[in-house]
């Protein structure tokens, strides 16, 4: 049987391109694309949620950010795949461009790249050749019979103030699910529905695809270039008008008071599930990562979860240095002194994703474990209790705290936080060194604060609370206690001790 690598290079030869971009996403540009739809996974065996591939006839370059440096090294065949490790502040597109010579042409799959991305590449001198179909694609039928209605502001109320002379096309799946108050809990790790939407003349319609609508409608069609794929953009042609942002994006990110109240209740149940796991770890011997992950899902279901919001990360010792470790091995048994990082979340009745990370220790911790844990805790406490409202600035503050308490060999190699909602990763808001984080976080926006420190020779610690902004102050949905055994209280200032005391309830 021909391998994926052979198949993709045969395609390149037939199409006359020496460079081909293979994506981790699908035509909806989903971040968490199921692996059975993930062409990058077929090529590289890398199972992370993000990270695209440049294929040449000599090499395959896998680009990954700091969350996946170690995981990529562990999963790929290095005789075939070269891992390009993006550092904080580096972007995938800029590093990709460096690998394309001036006279080179890059083949791309139009349905799997946003219009914003292709315009950036062209602006930077990259000649593109578009292909409509990816030869590695597998046909996956979507069963819409599982879609359910959830409570929320009506579609009519949401769109009544959209005053645009033409049709507005919504192509982001989170926005579509939000707009129609529809969810699909039939698969783990998502509550989104699949489809696109058009808003026209005070009404909204749900579409499977846009082809028939584009052909029959003669007016202007307004789009968000960051969420529409290049195929759909070109299909619209001269009818296209560009929006600076989808009118649904900001609306979705600023939660209603009812949504905030749902989240408060959902996180109470999430806290209880994690507390049950803490007790399970404390009171049982010879348990594995796999045992904990299985028990965790049962606890979520016991407290009413519809499904998990992402695949739980249960990582002990060195595995915890992989920011998005996802194996949960039966062979990784907790021993005395084992550190275990648990990053998890669930969907409840409203289909909004919860997200929390805690780190526990089996038995007695080492001094290094306590030092790293307490440093991460200091980063969280200072970021959480600041009066800052811009994600970029909050991220900088956490990094400043680490620079004042640096630990040799441990790195903080990801952003401080992300928005949450219908998906576990949403924008806005964003807390990172990225330019898109340089905007103010508005009241009722929901987001995570999750500093972490990692050393692949030892372990990693990440502490994550999902939060919201209220009256210009950050409030936490999460109230699960921190691991007292891992806190070196001598490292905390009196202010930090007081903050910790005020925060914890479980």
Where in the sequence are the language-model features?
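Active-site neighborhoods and metal-handling regions in enzymes and metal-associated proteins
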Residues: 1-506
């Amino acid at each position: 049987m021909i391998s994926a690598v052979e198949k993709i290079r045969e395609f390149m030869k037939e199409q006359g391109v020496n460079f081909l971009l293979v994506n981790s996403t699908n035509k909806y540009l989903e971040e968490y694309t199921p692996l059975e739809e993930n062409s990058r996974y077929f090529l590289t065996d890398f199972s992370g949620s993000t990270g695209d591939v440049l294929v040449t006839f000599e090499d395959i370059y896998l680009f990954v950010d700091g969350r996946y440096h170690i995981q990529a090294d562990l999963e790929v065949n290095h005789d075939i795949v070269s891992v390009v490790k993006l550092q904080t502040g580096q972007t995938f597109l800029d590093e990709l461009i460096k690998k394309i010579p001036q006279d080179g042409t890059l083949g791309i799959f139009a349905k799997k790249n946003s219009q914003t991305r292709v315009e950036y590449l062209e602006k930077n001198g990259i000649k593109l050749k578009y292909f409509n179909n990816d030869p590695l694609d597998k046909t996956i039928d979507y069963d819409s019979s599982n879609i359910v209605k959830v409570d929320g502001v009506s579609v009519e109320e949401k769109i009544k103030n959209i005053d645009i002379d033409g049709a507005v096309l919504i192509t982001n799946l989170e926005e579509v699910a939000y707009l129609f108050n529809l969810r699909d809990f039939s698969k783990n790790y998502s509550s989104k529905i699949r489809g696109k939407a058009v808003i026209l003349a005070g009404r909204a319609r749900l579409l499977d695809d846009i082809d028939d609508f584009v052909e029959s409608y003669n007016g202007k069609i307004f789009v968000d270039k960051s969420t529409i794929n290049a195929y759909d953009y070109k299909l619209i042609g001269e009818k296209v008008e560009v929006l600076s942002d989808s009118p649904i994006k900001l609306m979705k990110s600023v939660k209603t008071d009812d949504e905030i109240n749902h989240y408060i209740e959902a996180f109470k149940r999430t806290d209880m599930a994690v507390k049950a796991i803490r007790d399970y770890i404390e009171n049982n011997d010879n348990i594995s990562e796999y045992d904990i992950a299985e028990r965790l899902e049962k606890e979520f279901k016991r407290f009413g979860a519809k499904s998990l919001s992402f695949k739980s990360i249960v990582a002990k010792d060195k595995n915890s240095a992989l920011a998005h470790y996802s194996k949960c091995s039966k062979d990784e048994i907790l021993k005395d002194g084992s550190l275990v990082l648990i990053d998890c979340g669930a969907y409840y009745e409203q289909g909004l994703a919860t997200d929390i990370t805690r780190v526990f220790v089996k038995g007695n911790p080492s001094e290094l474990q306590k030092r790293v844990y307490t440093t991460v805790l200091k980063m969280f406490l200072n970021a959480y209790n600041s009066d800052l409202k811009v994600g970029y600035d909050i991220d900088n503050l956490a990094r400043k705290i680490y620079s004042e308490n640096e630990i040799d060999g441990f790195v903080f190699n990801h952003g401080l936080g992300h928005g949450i909602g219908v998906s576990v990763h949403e924008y806005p808001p964003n807390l990172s060194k990225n330019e898109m984080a340089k905007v103010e976080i508005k009241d009722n926006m929901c987001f995570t604060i999750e500093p972490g420190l990692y050393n692949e020779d030892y372990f990693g610690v990440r502490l994550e609370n999902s939060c919201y902004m209220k009256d210009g102050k950050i409030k936490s949905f999460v109230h699960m206690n921190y691991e007292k055994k891992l806190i070196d209280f001598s490292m905390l200032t009196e202010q930090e001790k007081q903050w910790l005391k005020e925060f914890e309830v479980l």
